[in-house]
Amino acid sequence: MAKPKIGLALGSGGARGLAHLGVLSSLHKHQIEVDMIAGSSMGALVGSFYAAGHDVATMKKVAKAFKRRLYADYTVPKLGFLKGDRVRQLVHAYTFGKPIEELQIPLGIVACDLQTGEKIVFRKGSVSDAVRASISIPGIFIPQRLDGRLLVDGAVVDRIPVSVVKDMGADIIIASDVSRVRKTETAVHIFDVIMQSMDILQNELVRHQTIAADIMIRPSLETYSSSSFANIEEMISAGEEATNRMISKIRKEIENWEGS
């Protein structure tokens, strides 16, 4: 009997995107196989590691060992504070230098052309370059120059890239939304100002947008900052718990598709 192709759309959200690891962990534990992934920003980073064949346990170790200061390659702030070379090197290493089209799971990576406002979806070529473009938070990272374009964070045009996995051929689409805005009183760093501003803007866009996913997973992340990696285990657990609650619904979607 034919099986539906399951697509997973991983949304942006800065550090909160680590909750995607919990989503992937739950799906794996319940033997729900993901056939294709699309990601914006942190969703692209997590998706690229998983598509390269890393299991969630390995990805958790990488996340817990992450120290933002080690990857903060500051530069004179003309177009952004961070060059992003160290993050690119990290992605290159953990995706084994492979192009997107050679990863174990088909992957779509979303970025935005800063000059035209066009959504750019990478389905082939360098994984590390595409992810570097997708995480280029305006004002923080220098935009990525690639193929004659100046590219910034995919979340600017598509925070939860459901349409991308649909175009990739998914029959059932699961989306992970980590866009809940943290209610904060104090911004202690310019990064906090930029991230909170982006969060508020994009949270409003998501709130007023119809997202055509069959299953929408929304981990409870309101108390966590998008710019802080201090609560990694808690954010991963939130993603896993939210997905566990949706497993029966996912199974029903699969059963209904098979019976149609």
UniProtKB/Swiss-Prot annotation:
A motif (DGA/G) lies at residues 153-155. PROSITE patterns: PNPLA (PS51635), UPF0028 (PS01237). Belongs to the NTE family. A motif (GXSXG) lies at residues 39-43. Keywords: Hydrolase, Lipid degradation, Lipid metabolism. SUPFAM superfamilies: FabD/lysophospholipase-like (SSF52151). This is Uncharacterized NTE family protein YlbK. GO terms for biological process: lipid catabolic process; phosphatidylcholine metabolic process. GO terms for molecular function: lysophospholipase activity. Residues 8-166 form the PNPLA domain. CDD domains: Pat_NTE_like_bacteria. The gene is ylbK. It comes from Bacillus subtilis (strain 168). The active site is at S41 (nucleophile), D153 (proton acceptor).
